[in-house]
Amino acid sequence: MEQFFWSYVWPALIMVGQSLLLLVCLLVAIAFLLLADRKVWAAVQLRRGPNVVGPFGLFQSFADLLKFILKEPVIPAGANKAVFLLAPLVAVTLALATYAVIPFADGWVVANINVGILYIFAISSLEVYGIIMGGWASNSKYPFLGALRSAAQMVSYEVSIGLVIVTVLLCVGSLNLTDIVLAQRTGLGTMMGLPASFLDWHWLSLFPMFIVFFISGLAETNRPPFDLPEAESELVAGHMVEYGSTPYMMFMLGEYAAIVLICCLTTILFLGGWLPIVDVWFLNWVPGIVWFALKGCMVFFMIALTKAFVPRYRYDQLMRLGWKVFLPLSLAMVVIVAFVLKLTGWAG
């Protein structure tokens, strides 16, 4: 019995504890990133943004959370109640489940599986079901139109994201996210005789794919300028029109969790993960989780600036960009990268 406990029960308890700790840290990070998003947008518009709740408005997101929890959920009369309430739960659960395989530093991962990137791609592809369920169950035309737009948009840009990931996998030769980060210790910089640095990361050697992945990530997470599913001027709020209180909060949490996931994946695939910008002794003292967080915040800042500066695309422009520009470009890059790797015999 004791052997059974230490062999099976204890590892399971450790994994549950790690998952709960990751969940708490992730929710706190999302709360402050949401505040940062609002602050950036306010600064661009020459406003102050949230500045009342707590010093510099730091507790605004927590006040909003409390407000949503204390509100009574209202279910439309013609809605399918079970599906209506299940939809936000599906959306937020799938969004949070992807973080199980994200390595925030060397060894800082809940489940270090060999097919981590495939797991993330599979789970994130299912997130559209939560949006479709919410749009259909609301029994209203605006949510349904928003859900249909979201399904078409996410499916269109998943193709480009998948091909971008294939180019990275060709260079690394592994589906393990930790291996993808460690492979970026050598690259174009070390080939030129320079010490390991940011010049070795994939953002330089795969720069077109870096741009495609970033823009496709915006479309995949319904962020401006690709926020067609919840366009306020057209569909009021898209699939979330009929939602309020806790279900609305869960949809928003799932949306921002997906945005943070794109920041994490961009950091891992193209920005060296937890690796320092230059491999020197005083930068190696900085914990890897700090480098990872700084790079992720930089990507999130770029996403926030895009929201503030770039106007919304029309639906036909969105589809044309995905199918007529990104898809051929991604396919061409897969062929070019494979040809170069075969010709040179180099990977890394």
Swiss-Prot record:
Domain of life where this protein originates = Bacteria
State the UniProt keywords alphabetically. Answer: Cell inner membrane, Cell membrane, Membrane, NAD, Quinone, Translocase, Transmembrane, Transmembrane helix, Ubiquinone
Bilayer topology reads: Multi-pass membrane protein
Q: Give the matching Pfam families.
A: NADHdh
- What GO terms fall under cellular component here? plasma membrane
Which reaction(s) does the protein catalyse, per the Swiss-Prot or TrEMBL entry?
a quinone + NADH + 5 H(+)(in) = a quinol + NAD(+) + 4 H(+)(out)
Which EC class is the enzyme in?
Answer: translocase
Question: Kinase as a keyword?
Answer: no
Sequence intervals crossing the membrane:
13-33, 50-70, 82-102, 115-135, 161-181, 198-218, 258-278, 285-305, 321-341
GO MF annotation, one: NADH dehydrogenase activity
Q: Which family does it belong to?
A: Belongs to the complex I subunit 1 family.
Q: List, alphabetically, the HAMAP family matched.
A: NDH1_NuoH
Report quaternary structure and partners. Answer: NDH-1 is composed of 14 different subunits. Subunits NuoA, H, J, K, L, M, N constitute the membrane sector of the complex.
Q: What does this gene product do? A: NDH-1 shuttles electrons from NADH, via FMN and iron-sulfur (Fe-S) centers, to quinones in the respiratory chain. The immediate electron acceptor for the enzyme in this species is believed to be ubiquinone. Couples the redox reaction to proton translocation (for every two electrons transferred, four hydrogen ions are translocated across the cytoplasmic membrane), and thus conserves the redox energy in a proton gradient. This subunit may bind ubiquinone.
Question: Would you tell me the protein name for this molecule?
Answer: NADH-quinone oxidoreductase subunit H
Q: From what organism does this protein derive?
A: Agrobacterium fabrum (strain C58 / ATCC 33970) (Agrobacterium tumefaciens (strain C58))
Q: Which gene encodes it?
A: nuoH
